[in-house]
Amino acid sequence: GVGRLSLDRLLPLLEEAAVLGIPAIALFPVTPPELKSPDGSEALNPDNLMCRAVRAIKAALPDLGVICDVALDPYTTHGQDGLIDDEGYVLNDETLAVLAQQALVQAEAGCDVIAPSDMMDGRIGVIRKTLDEAGLHHTRIMSYAAKYASAFYGPFRDAVGSSGALGKRGKETYQLDPANTDEALREVA
């Protein structure tokens, strides 16, 4: 099972984790349906759930590392990781600027490691440039070098509330085919 925790339940659990010597935790948001939009604008809100959680964690446990997911699927009405056109095709280049701004608001909230799970081509360079221009040189980026358009992500999509919005659409246009090992090896090289 996948658990979801509100902020009031999260902090006591993280205090236990810190006592156990766990150095960092990863956050994935669940966005209420009324805050979702086609462009995922809630991802850019400096007072969204993710940013509030980061600030609360850093206030209570400043030495605990915080890893923040960067992707639009928890914030979009269509469940895709990026912006889409009228036919539902994901717009890679247009999405990059939004992802960079999402990473920026998370880093400004205190996130230690940005983890872009969206799989848009070129995202790492654009995010790094945006963070550096804002003086956030020490914010690290954890690259998802290879991510598959696989049913194994079903529980995750359920957890962040994006699976229902996807319907019959998939993420094959920007995530790897699990059967294509050659492509996976090229991506991670």
Residue ranges and their predicted role:
Residues 1-189:
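Alpha/beta enzyme core
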